[in-house]
Amino acid sequence: MKILFLACLRAHTGNSTTALRIKDHLEAAGHTCVLKDAAILESSEVETLISQEKFNAGLIIQLYKAGRFLMGNRIPFGAIFGGTDINEDVKNEEKCRVMGAVLEEARFVVAFTHKIKELAATKWPHAKHKIHIQPQGILTKPSKSFDYEAFLQNAGIRHKSGHLHLYVLICGLRRVKDPLYLAEMFAKWHEKEPNVYLAIIGPMVDPVFTKEVENKLEEIDGVYLIKEIPQSDLQAVIKRSFALVNSSLSEGMSAAILEAMDLEVPVLARDIPGNSAIIKHEDTGLLFSTPQEFVQLSKRLMTEPELKRRIVSNAKRYVNSNHSWELERDTYQTLILNLQVNGNI
């Protein structure tokens, strides 16, 4: 099949990473898969694309932002829930209506978690039978040639050899990711313990908010903003870090958290539904509800080696069992067959 795949493709963000991985799964099964950025498309462009390029199937990530472009375009399509669908867009009446119409037309829908399926089935009961649960598959390949010391030096992070505790927070710079949530508390901690640093790594998604972040970080020490870097380099940074941090206001399923688990790096995450769906507190990671609690838990991680060992070991086992890249590949290669002309769910 020739598949038109629509997703919001901001570089080095979760959606982009997920889309590229699924595209690879489909092409491995012999399909032609053309990935387009839904963030910059117009409806008329999609109609022209479908007719000129002779696509016979479609796939989308995010029901509203991408799904609306395939409605009524006469090609069968499948859909994948994004975190924004359930956490944000569902609160808007018009967006919610469009999402319901997309679900009506979609041959199949994928949810990353049972919770997302439950929320969707409650909102759109007519689509319950179409929703398949497939957690994100994780495959990490950290760069072996990455120069970590040069990376730290370029970021302005000065440290004594062997004494650095680097925390990394990976996100596209937008308000929902709340990257400044821990900034002031972390700066106070850094003042007392100069070997702790927080690196916020990611692309400028919201220019206005990015400027706010830059201005804030100019006022404090110990917290650094670093532009996005290639995926393999980013994974090399995670692997050398003391812990990965997530402070988002809402999440679908954070690929960065799962990658850290796979790389055997402990995770400290804000206690929100998207994070607690994949982290069991003090078992596969640590969940915090306030900046003060984050520091308390971080200190425990530093002083209780058995806690760190248990979390890292259990998290690695969890990822291997529940986020298999091979199982994800099998799922999408099977589901996509529902888009053949006479395919049924």
UniProtKB/Swiss-Prot annotation:
Keywords: Glycoprotein, Glycosyltransferase, Secreted, Signal, Transferase. The gene is glt1d1. Glycans are attached at residues 246, 322. This is Glycosyltransferase 1 domain-containing protein 1. The lineage of its organism: Eukaryota, Metazoa, Chordata, Craniata, Vertebrata. It comes from the Eukaryota. Its EC number is 2.4.-.-. One of its GO terms (cellular component) is extracellular region. GO terms for molecular function: glycosyltransferase activity. It comes from Xenopus tropicalis (Western clawed frog). It is an enzyme of class 2 (transferase). InterPro entries: Glyco_trans_1, Glycosyltransferase_G1. Transmembrane segments: none annotated. It is found in: Secreted. Belongs to the glycosyltransferase group 1 family. Glycosyltransferase 4 subfamily. Residues 1-19 form the signal peptide.
